[in-house]
Amino acid sequence: MKPNAVKAFSLAVVLLAGPICSRAVTILSGPSFTRATNAPLAGVLQLATDVETRVSVSVSDGTNVWQRRFYDYATTHSVPLLGFKPNRTNEITVTVYDRYQNPVTAAQPLVFITNPLPSNFPNIVLLQSQPDRMEPGYTLFNVMMKNSTYWYVAIVDSSGEVVWYNGAPSTADVRRLDNGDLFMPWTTNFVEMNLLGQIVNSWVVPTNLPINLHDGVPTSHGTILYLSDAVMVVSNYPTSMTNPVAPRATAKVRYQNVVEISATNAAVLHTWTPINFLDPLRISYLIVNSLGSWDSEHSNAVIEDPSDDSLIVSMCMQNAVIKFSRATGQLRWILGPPANWGPAWQPYLLTPVGTPFVWQYGQHAPILTPQGTLILFDNGNYRASPFAPILSVTNYYSRAVEYSINEKTMQVSQVWDYGTTNAAQRLYVDHEGNAEPEPLTGNVLTDFAAVSYVNGVAPSSFGPTATMTRITEVTHDALPQIVFDLAISLYANTNTSYKDCETYRSHRIPDLYAHPAQPVADLSVTLEYGPPFLQFSADDTRTYVIQASTNLVDWEAIGAALEDEQQSGDFSFADVGAEALPVRYYRVLTQ
């Protein structure tokens, strides 16, 4: 549950005096491949060898050829194979290498035939893709259809092709853990699922603190944050969101607690009740009476701000994002339109400065960026607060927006947005969505989760309730450039009369596999030609620093290993400064 921080793993090796020899490797059993029961595009490769080996596979699916190299040495291998595409005949060629890089290839390739996607799977159409400008990796999302009566967790590549899916029973967010598994909320528990579709962990919450499916957040310190619904009775509650002189009455108001549990044993560690320091009588045009109570907050996200040990919560029905102290529950600020906040909350309202500036309405999924700004998905519901006039729904728009908050001056400025006049199309999403800043490119991946209007018109002849999804990646420029655009819908699906389709959030994941920092397992040093020559195989997503010593106590970094241009994962380093030394020790630090 903890993030995969950069770690230094090392292996010390004494200089060798000559070439390395070894006998041939023998494959004792296998290889065999077994399709995963709950992940139709994945499976497990198994084989055994007489000496410790690592595995490499080459897959030809009739259209493309791709490779995967694994760097764990063992005599018995059980390796998940991921990344197959539907409706393909895959030939899997298996090669094993011993610690001296001697290869043996299995006599015959394995054959894995993948089925077509299910008949009720949504239609995915790639509208644009520029892989050289995109954030590297794959796009993960949970797509819901038929009024949320069935759904699929799916992963697509940069060409929009499905490379993994599972009919997971969760209607909300799904996110990738650092170990490569998926984390998602159910109504009674959180689950961790690997990409073979197996549930490998579960956290059951107390019955009096049920999970609100909008969010579940594994933290860096071994806990899980989530939202939990509760109801309180208040007096003098407005009975109309549109009539300022309507009578007031005693009413039930629904709100969300913020709960923190242990990732070790699911024990409750903390509970916060934001409605206690907010105004339970404040209204917006979004608030509705449902399930026997007024949906006052509809909190949909909680995140940590580690800079001052505080929590940030998005309350879409309040058109507000709030920040409060984790330790004391003290309110820090309120981001959102100031209408209908009483005198007690005026000191906490952020004041907008600079132009352009537009408040967010019905927002989802705030994220703190490395620059300290706050980016979120602004749904844009109504674009007004009671009792001001509202626009026609055909004029609404949704966007990704980034704000900079100065807590000393209690001011907020708009840094960047995408989806207003700087977008090719004006999309409106009345619920769900997220905007995710990407770490390598700075691009922003935006999930227009449930599009009901495009340029003020329903996206299809089925009307605005037949929503579709647009997942768009744009550059973080004043005039953003689209580098990836994916449309997901049920419009062309004749197997269902329902045509609504939505994705709660989308995420760019760097790979289908995790890449933890691991020690190099096959470092060799030879003196046959010239200076000491170091060689090893390792994960090419990492960098490897060579350190040297003459006494195994004092170590000095002497350079970084270089990857072979022809063979990914093969690294080498020539120590040209070692010739005058009587003895030299080496170790490799994985970063």
Protein language model features and the residues they cover:
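Short, composition-biased motifs enriched in small/polar/acidic residues
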Residues: 517-591
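Surface-exposed loop/edge segments in extracytoplasmic proteins
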Residues: 62-70, 163-164, 200, 553-560
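Short S/T/G- and acidic-enriched coil/turn segments that sit immediately N-terminal to beta-strands
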Residues: 75-80, 571-573
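Short, flexible loop/turn segments at beta-strand junctions in immunoglobulin-like
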Residues: 81-86, 575-579
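Short beta-strand segments within Ig-like beta-sandwich modules, predominantly Fibronectin type-III
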Residues: 68-74, 562-567
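Bacterial N-terminal signal peptides
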Residues: 8-19
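Short beta-strand segments enriched for Tyr within beta-sheet-rich domains
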Residues: 84, 88-96, 544, 584-586
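Histidine-/acidic-rich catalytic cores in large beta-rich domains
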Residues: 25-46, 50-55, 59, 78, ...
